[in-house]
Each structure stands twice: as C-alpha cells, then as structure tokens.
Amino acid sequence: MLVTPEYVFKDVTHITPEWLAQKCIRALVLDIDNTLTADRSQELPEEVAGWLEAMRRAGVKLTIVSNGAEKRVRPFAEKLGLAYLYRSAKPLPFALGVARRRMQVKRREMALVGDQLYADRMAAALYGIPGLMVIPRGPDLGAQVVLKRKWEKKHWQEYYDRGGKTL
C-alpha cells in the first residue's frame, strides 16, 4: 500500500546503524519537521545530534529532502553540514532521485525517514524504497498538516492491526 507504513520507529534515534546494515541500507534521506526536530524549529535536539554523528561514523550517507522553503531548510542543513533539497514536492519522488545520485548509491541501498504518510511514506513507495516512519516529535503547526494527520489515522491503524510494531 502506498500510504500504510512499512516500518515505524519511536523516533529517529531508534534507527540504528546495525538495523540499517541488516537491511543493506547505506544512505538515508531525512525529513526535517517533526522528524529531526519540532515543526518549524531551527534547534536540533541533543539526542538527534548524537544520532547523526553515530550515523556518520557508521558510514551512512545522509541528505535532507524537505518540502520546506529554502529559508527554512538551508540554515538548518548547513548548521548540520548536510546536503539538502528544499521545496521537494513530496510525495512526488523526483527529489529522491536527485538525492540518490548525489549520494552515489543504488536505489535498493537507500531509505527515507519521515513522519507524514501522505508526503514521506508515499514518496518512498512511489520511488520504490523503504519508508522509515517516525512518531512526530511535536505538534503540527500548519493547518494543511493537521488535516492530513486526520486522514492518516486509518493507515496507522492498518499497520498496527496487521501486527506492526513501533521499533
């Protein structure tokens, strides 16, 4: 299913280099808002900074792909020293192809980490890569996202009804 989650993690810090290695994933495309940090925040939680460093030490390639504007994405990504794409138009998968080529990995070696089913999970499914969904880090500040969250509820329920677990 394009929208129902495949994998769900409590937050990004529960995605480990060991888990990625078991799945042969060498590169991650990362969303920002409610994935790495709270919605619209420029502050990175300490535990997420440590997680990013652990991923780098493990050789995992990282790129930010966000639907946000350049003025939102660029300062955040540059502070972290990460490559980035802004206004990526997820769920359309085109930016994922750009990110894959920049990271110089095969499609089967990458996954997308995000919090929204109708943007992140659908983009991953359309591109043919795993979507690693995380529980949102905080409340949604945009009316459009609040509306999408209501639509997402049935897909989250499908995941758990099928025996899906939060990792």
What kind of feature is each model-predicted range?
Residues 1-30, 37, 41-42, 47-112, ...:
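Asp-based, Mg2+/Mn2+-dependent phosphohydrolase catalytic module
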